[in-house]
């Protein structure tokens, strides 16, 4: 792909165009990336003032002791990727460099130098999968910059040349730099890695460094626009953690290197995305894992940058729980948390003010809960959007639900990419007839949404969130899912509500076209399911119960379906089952599907349960 740098120089107005005429005298001396010379003292003071920061600091030091006993990372690919080795190199070098700056103990310096020299000797950093290059470049750039004055001249030369020849120069190869024009996590990660490299070697190669910094300022604007209008990240929880963390690593490095000259004019959607991410985790600690995402929640370093930038400690409510856990995160960016939390105390972190959060954009989502502080609170996530987004699944209209600390309605999430790629699956083809949609976990058949006439959702269909309300007693959101079923339905709308903080309603209002349609309603769960009547089923897990009750149609036959996949390449789904029902709707007819999810002890309010979606409260609050 031939790339037009002028395009990015023009588009960089909303961020910053750093003129190539900048010279190295305008940059701080080494260390200049994220933590300037002398800033260690303030960091030490903050760590000493809070036992959680102190525990995090000592966890990093303990990990460094383990790293010192390990051989350096080797160039060993998994499939087409070197990424796990690049990530481990970044973890090691970042941790060790941090440890040296905070303790001045030579063992950390020596081990970081060994790690960097080993990576510098690799034949390449696998530019055909450029994420690998980006993370390795960031690793060596942090070590080179933070340890610059202590490295021998020979080591400096070898590491600097590796950053340039194996990191920066390959980013101009048009066979590998397609990510410059992308609007997803690849852009954020790769531009961050290249910018770290440019900042590290600025004084010896100012022309190359300036060109890369200037290029990144325009290019990284593209994915940052995808957070508009209100912060919902199209790729979901896991890739928010990846793309956004590297995006703020980029911003943090630029802010420190250029000071007041750097004013990126961050868009509102990007800044609001921290609230989106915080709301994505339920009381159980499990995230809403739609799209390519694992099941568990995890510490998100970028949240600490947002909390500091917005002066809003409540953004760290979920992160606080991860830090308080017995086993701290081993995230490769963990030292950045201590840099970005400087001046904040764990005791200053309060719960968020709102119990509902709605995000529109390319992949809309609504998130609601009855409480932030009660571990037994009800939590619901409802997804609109489109299968066509990067890393998307056929999950428009799908939802997750938990109560009493149990995730009752779940999402299987992603399958390991290499397991599918090595089986020859055409995984990254997003067209309607792609083999991607034959993967069990990726299509609508296994998600908590509808299947019409046994067909896949329409890939280029889009389901907006059309209404929501934060009204106490009737938290709700509604999505128009017509477009993903447009071949078979004239209209389809799904609403989900939490009623009186006690139970959940899932309501679908449908209209068929000129043909009869068979509608399947599905709920995926890891609970034990017992059909207790035509319209009711009991779910049991961890000694707790939930009743699934269908109030419309008046009579259906609930059933269960196996989650054993049909293809050898599909991952197993042990301990899960699907429950639901099928109905036939005549041509040109309307139908209502109304399902209640009643945690143990909850009593239905029939006057609310029977209300149409048009009767549900709606507001336009800016959550």
Each PLM stretch: what is its role?
Residues 73-80, 138-238, 246-249, 335-355:
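Active-site lining segments of carbohydrate-active enzymes
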Residues 30-49, 90-106, 118-126, 136-154, ...:
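Well-ordered alpha-helical scaffold segments within catalytic/enzyme domains
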Residues 60-72, 110-127, 158-178, 211-231, ...:
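Long, well-ordered core segments of solenoidal/helical folds
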Residues 178, 201, 242-408, 467-474, ...:
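Carbohydrate-active enzyme catalytic cores, enriched for enzymes
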Residues 19-21:
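C-terminal motif of bacterial Sec signal peptides marking the signal peptidase cleavage site
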Residues 1-11:
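Bacterial N-terminal signal peptides that target proteins for export
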Residues 24, 319-324, 419-623:
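CBM-like, beta-strand-rich accessory domains located in the C-terminal region of large
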Residues 25-79:
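Low-complexity, Ser/Thr/Pro/Gly-enriched N-terminal "stalk/linker" regions
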